[in-house]
Amino acid sequence: MAVNETAEVSVGGEQMAIHTSRPDGADKSPAIIVIQEIFGVNNNIKSIAERFANEGYFAAAPEMFHRSGSGIDIPFSEMEKAFAERGKLSGDNIEDDVQATIDYLKNNPNVDASNIGIVGFCFGGMVSYLGSTNTDISAAAIYYGGGILPRPDAAEGTPRLLDATADAVQAPIIGFWGDQDGGIPVSNVEEIEKTLKAKGKSIENHVYEGAGHGFFCEDRGSYNEAAANDSWPKTLAFFAEHLK
């Protein structure tokens, strides 16, 4: 049974809560950072952290929206509010939050600090991709990470995160995508893979037919049971290979 707790760390002089879930009685466990969607660290994200704990990992889900307050949990129906919160975060903010979470894990007696992975969903998938450039991260899993390449409807000249960061990727990546995701066309997924492989990076992508954005979240209308049930064991196998 997992032990669920909340810690607080300082980021730029502000407090950030980190929701943790770890194996009961475990000495040192490999760790996985679980990055939220644009809705905050809600019950879905906390349950994913607990699922990882039940598989033997110390899971840590930082509240990336802490600059707007603690415990932010935006309803799935309030997309405009969710995008507004995400829009407040700069690249430096994201990097600082991830590093603060890593530092917390490295100083935690229950964590094997040499084996830290990261997984993220939606906005968090992009954060997980960025995490793969951090030398403290040993493996990164991306679930429909938006923003690595511009959306099809993005304004001309929108920055291409992939171009700016691909050279720095150092951790192996596994990605899970839906072919019905309106914001992330399969052509983007293919370009991400082609670009990274051309630079000698390790990436393995899985694209699910009929699945849309948010297919892993049981609480969303976009939940796709087949895609969710196939991606989870693949995620566990990936982390077991690189973190255990």
Report each predicted region and the residues it spans.
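N-terminal cap/leader regions of alpha/beta-hydrolase-fold enzymes
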Residues: 1-244
